[in-house]
């Protein structure tokens, strides 16, 4: 068995009494993505309307107490929370997309395409417009309620999450909820609408340390669920009968891996608005560059999702300065053609 594994190009990695089979090439690619994230993050930290030279940036990170008040505020209260929020939300959406595509066995599946984002958005928007005194910590909870409600509605109408019509029904529900969001926007106060429009476009400019902490607290359970059920998900891909014969509890697995992406997506939408197509693109890119099982797919999707959001946010912030284009708009410009190509390639299955 060990010789066969080595001949296949895998290397066993022991961790906490478990063994994962990883390709050395995949490890190198993952390491290169991490280095790219680090380099892009440092570049984003140093660029903006108030540029920070490399020497000043390094000194600020090592000894922040020696900085002036203005550069310290810009670096630690504006740019750093924004970059970390981009990384976190991108990773959350990448994980959500990978899990949704796995459980539905459909490469077109994405929580954003089945109305989860719109469900979370409409509840959070109602909370912001009509109950502005509600604390920030309750927004992800409200978004999660909306996202789960929409997911249950789509699942009930489609009857089976593995059928192609699950995606089509989700798109229809998503458009209906988008119309409801438009009704909210036309009846609310103009000042509130302006703020809501920036948030709905997927802007990270309002990222703060408290908001980042809230997002992390809601993201952690979803990520833990997905990684803990990754091995069972690999077995489930062999077929229902085989999985049951090997001891996989399919019903519990389906419930966990269906609602974990809903939790991750709802938390992301509640904090930074809609970042479309990240959950659709990241898993496909991860499969192409990393390959392997669910653990490899989840890790790759999280890294690539983080890279997509950070890159598009940096581009939208710097390319047209002083005008800042929300990351959600930049991602949509890339994601729409990507979705059309996927739809065309899978047209016979729909």
Go through the PLM ranges and name each one:
Residues 2-350:
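Alpha-helical transmembrane segments in inner-membrane proteins
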């Amino acid at each position: 068995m060990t010789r066969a594994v080595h001949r296949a190009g895998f290397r066993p990695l022991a961790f906490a009494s478990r063994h994962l089979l990883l390709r050395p090439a995949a490890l190198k690619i993952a390491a290169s993505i991490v280095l790219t994230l680090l380099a892009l993050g440092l570049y984003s930290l140093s660029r903006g309307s108030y540029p920070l030279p490399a020497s000043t940036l390094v000194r600020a990170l090592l000894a922040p107490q020696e900085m002036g008040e203005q550069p310290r505020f810009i670096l630690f209260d504006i740019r750093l929370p924004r970059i970390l929020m981009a990384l976190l939300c991108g990773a959350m959406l990448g994980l959500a997309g990978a899990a949704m595509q796995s459980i539905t066995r459909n490469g077109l599946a994405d929580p954003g395409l089945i109305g989860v984002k719109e469900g979370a958005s409409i509840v959070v928007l109602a909370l912001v417009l009509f109950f502005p005194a509600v604390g920030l910590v309750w927004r992800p909870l409200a978004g999660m309620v909306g996202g789960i409600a929409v997911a249950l509605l789509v699942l009930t109408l489609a009857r089976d999450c593995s059928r192609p019509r699950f995606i089509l029904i989700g798109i229809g529900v998503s458009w209906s909820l988008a119309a409801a969001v438009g009704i909210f926007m036309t009846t609310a106060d103009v000042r509130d609408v302006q703020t809501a429009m920036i948030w709905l476009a997927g802007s990270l400019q309002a990222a703060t340390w408290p908001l980042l902490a809230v997002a992390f607290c809601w993201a952690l359970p979803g990520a833990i669920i997905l990684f803990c059920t990754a091995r069972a998900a690999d077995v489930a891909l062999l077929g229902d009968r085989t999985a049951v014969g090997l001891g996989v509890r399919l019903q519990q697995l389906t419930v966990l891996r269906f609602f974990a992406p809903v939790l991750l997506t709802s938390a992301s939408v509640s904090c930074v608005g809609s970042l479309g197509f990240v959950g659709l693109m990241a898993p496909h890119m991860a499969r192409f560059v990393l390959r392997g099982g669910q653990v490899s797919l989840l890790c790759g999707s999280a890294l690539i999702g983080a890279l997509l959001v950070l890159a598009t946010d940096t581009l939208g912030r710097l390319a047209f300065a002083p005008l800042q284009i929300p990351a959600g708009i930049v991602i949509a410009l890339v994601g729409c053609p990507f979705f059309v190509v996927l739809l065309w390639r899978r047209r016979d299955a729909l």
